[in-house]
């Protein structure tokens, strides 16, 4: 029997007063209880802001990313502990894999992105420098800094692990402490994974808190620096979003709500094609995976008029082979709903849809393997058919959050798009077609009503992640009924927990704040070549002005012969003049870059270990034989790298390169990246206190 405690103010706390029962979805038996009565929600928010926040913000993005990675590794080592707990929610092994290992995967994904897409700083510089004055003495730049409040995460019952981890990953990477409020249904699984995270001792005090029971007055205490992220029904989300405290303090509220997602069968995908079979397989999977309890599940199947009978027959056959029962029994492909309350809710919603649709599959007795159908929360798949979906709104307005799907016909692509849009905003829509013209018309016609759209055909099917799978590197959310919010999406998900600030000032001031050299800022020159300096000795703004080199016609011809690039503008004076761009034969741009390297590189063995990249290259003016060039090389940014045991301590130095001609005009501008030896290893992520 689980006695679920809450985790508040750095301690496990058992709720007082009446408790809520936790029930096994398969057997109907009580498996535990929990309560949040007695918790001081205001104190929990203050603890997160005053204890967890300052410590998390003292870490750099890279340190927080490594923290996530170590937590993810630890959770993967313990993953098998969570599968039996997941089966109690009605999830099959496959369902649980998506929830458990998919959730842990978001931590791995954000750990990787945190080190690749953010610098090793406590803030993030966004976008290019914006010139704001004629002479360059006044410029602008955007930076992102962590919000100094707490993130309140209110999660749904259908994914107890993924629902928690997909919100925690970007928030913790941003440096914001979190209070997790899972649905009480299934909270025994959330509780176990949460405790496993604490067992790693990777997170600092105050970084995480957990409420297993009701949240009651929690949102009454949020303030302007807090963030609320909600996943659940549209009705509940809209009610919470309108809370007086949310409105009064303009609290960021990200809402991801269940929606009437659709899948469209293209007119080319007739029976006998691979695409028709893919459509049948995808709709069936979305109806039976998690017993249809997914916010991304297909609720509306939009098919060409005339193919309804074929689609109904194929879906009925495939659904008929789906074994329902105890998910721990071998061969069972679909488990029960999460609770008896869900059974009543789904049945009621399906009945309401049937006011506009005919039941064409399901609805009668069904067999259950390894369990008692009356005691468990079982509900068999149902297929409905709406013959007039343009005038009957029930299938577009009512969601049965379970294995229920409504088939509806369209006469042309314009009508298919119209039906897709009638969901009034969806998390995801899919189109099954092998015709690029169909894909273009449908996707561009329906895109503004969707957060994500999948085009599925024979080419992508083998590797496709499917209609219902949100991915950490793509946005998850949708307009309108879907909540109007957005989660994940790679670095975008992190920015929801950061404040964007527009900076204005002189280039030197902006450089001092961002620690990234801005053109026009002060430069430092000395007698030591910058390639002779270690990473630690180099300073942002260190600059080398090279000697000059005059480019000759022999240089151009030699480079053409060596590279094989004999483009006419380099080799024929008359042809070069004829194109209206050049005044005559012009040097290869890549020769200019190579010649520039010859001017600024120090060739001897030293701290520079390797050149591993060139970015943002632009050729701003032609270089003709007889022109003389030199280079201004400036340290633009430094990023210390983590130093695994046995490797050379190093960091990445980004250099601003400007190649200049004899008229003091830039002819090429770009950045190069070098690995430079450090004097000492980078400290590992600070350990939790």
PLM features: residue spans?
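HotDog/MaoC-like acyl-thioester-processing domains
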Residues: 530-540, 623-689
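Short, well-ordered beta-strand elements within core beta-sheets of diverse protein domains
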Residues: 18, 31-37, 53-57, 131-132, ...
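Hydrophobic beta-strand-centered segment that forms part of the acyl-chain substrate-binding groove
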Residues: 578-587, 591-637
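Conserved C-terminal structural/oligomerization subdomain of aldehyde/semialdehyde dehydrogenase
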Residues: 27-32, 66, 202-205, 224-227, ...
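Rossmann-like NAD(P) dinucleotide-binding subdomain of oxidoreductase/dehydrogenase enzymes
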Residues: 118-278, 410, 463, 485
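N-terminal Rossmann-like NAD(P)+-binding subdomain of aldehyde/semialdehyde dehydrogenases
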Residues: 1-136, 183, 321, 338
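ALDH superfamily catalytic-core signature
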Residues: 200-201, 225-227, 235-390, 412-414, ...
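Catalytic strand-loop segment that frames the active site of acyl-thioester-processing enzymes
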Residues: 526-587, 678
């Amino acid at each position: 029997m689980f006695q679920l405690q809450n985790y508040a103010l750095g301690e496990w706390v058992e709720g007082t007063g009446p408790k809520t029962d936790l029930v096994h979805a398969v057997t109907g038996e009580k498996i535990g209880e929990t309560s949040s009565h007695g918790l001081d929600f205001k104190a929990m928010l203050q603890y997160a802001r005053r204890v967890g926040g300052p410590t998390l913000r003292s870490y750099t993005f890279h340190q927080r990313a490594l923290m996530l990675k170590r937590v993810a590794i630890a959770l993967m080592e313990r993953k098998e502990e969570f599968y039996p707990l997941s089966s109690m929610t009605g999830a099959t092994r496959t369902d649980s894999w998506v929830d458990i290992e998919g959730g842990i995967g978001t931590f791995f994904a954000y750990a990787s992105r945190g080190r690749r897409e953010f610098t090793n700083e406590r803030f993030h510089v966004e976008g290019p420098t914006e010139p704001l004055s004629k002479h360059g003495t006044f410029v602008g730049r955007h930076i992102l800094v962590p919000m100094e409040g707490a993130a309140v995460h209110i999660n749904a019952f259908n994914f107890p692990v993924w629902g928690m981890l997909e919100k925690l990953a970007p928030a913790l990477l941003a440096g914001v402490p979190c209070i997790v409020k899972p649905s009480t249904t299934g909270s025994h699984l959330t509780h176990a994974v949460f405790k496993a995270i604490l067992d790693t001792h990777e997170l600092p005090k105050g970084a995480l808190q957990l409420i297993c029971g009701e949240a009651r007055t929690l949102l009454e205490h949020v303030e302007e620096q807090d963030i609320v992220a909600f996943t659940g029904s549209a009705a509940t989300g809209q009610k919470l979003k309108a809370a007086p405290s949310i409105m009064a303090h303009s609290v960021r509220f990200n809402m991801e709500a269940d929606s009437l997602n659709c899948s469209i069968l293209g007119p080319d995908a007739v029976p006998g094609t691979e695409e028709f079979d893919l459509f049948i397989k995808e709709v069936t999977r979305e109806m039976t995976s998690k017993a249809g309890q997914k916010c991304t599940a297909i609720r509306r199947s939009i098919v060409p008029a005339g193919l309804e009978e074929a689609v109904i027959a194929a879906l009925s056959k495939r659904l008929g082979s789906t074994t329902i029962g105890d998910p721990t029994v071998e061969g069972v492909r679909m488990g029960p709903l999460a609770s008896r309350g869900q059974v009543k809710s789904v049945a009621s919603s399906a009945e309401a849809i049937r006011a506009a649709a005919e039941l064409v599959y399901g609805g009668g007795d069904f067999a259950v393997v390894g369990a008692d159908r009356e005691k468990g929360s079982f509900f068999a798949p149902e297929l409905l058919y709406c013959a007039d979906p343009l005038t009957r709104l029930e299938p577009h307005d009512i969601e049965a959050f379970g294995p229920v799907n409504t088939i509806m016909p369209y006469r042309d692509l314009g009508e298919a798009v119209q039906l897709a849009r009638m969901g009034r905003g969806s998390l995801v829509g899919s189109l099954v077609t092998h015709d690029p013209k169909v894909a273009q018309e449908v996707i561009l016609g329906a895109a503004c009503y969707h957060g994500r759209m999948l085009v599925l055909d024979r080419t992508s099917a083998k590797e496709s992640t499917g209609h219902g799978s949100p991915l950490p590197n793509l946005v998850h959310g949708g307009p309108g009924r879907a909540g109007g919010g957005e989660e994940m999406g790679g670095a975008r998900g992190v920015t929801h927990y950061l404040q964007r600030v527009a900076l204005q000032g002189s280039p030197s001031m902006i450089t001092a704040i961002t620690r990234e050299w801005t053109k026009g800022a002060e430069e430092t020159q000395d007698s030591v070549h910058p390639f002779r300096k270690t990473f630690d000795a180099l300073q942002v703004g260190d600059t080398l002005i090279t000697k000059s080199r005059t480019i000759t016609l022999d240089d151009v011809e030699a480079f053409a012969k060596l590279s094989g690039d004999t483009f006419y503008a380099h080799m024929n004076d008359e042809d070069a003049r004829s194109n209206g761009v050049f005044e005559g034969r012009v040097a290869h741009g890549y020769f200019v870059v190579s010649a520039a390297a010859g001017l600024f590189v120090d060739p001897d063995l030293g701290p520079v270990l390797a050149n591993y990249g060139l970015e943002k290259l632009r050729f701003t003016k032609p270089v003709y034989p007889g022109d003389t060039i030199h280079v201004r090389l400036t340290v633009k940014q430094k990023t210390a790298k983590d130093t695994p045991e046995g490797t050379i301590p190093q960091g990445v130095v980004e250099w601003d390169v400007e190649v200049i001609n004899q008229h003091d005009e830039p002819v090429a501008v770009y950045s190069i990246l070098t690995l430079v030896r450090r004097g000492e290893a980078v400290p590992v992520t600070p350990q939790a206190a």
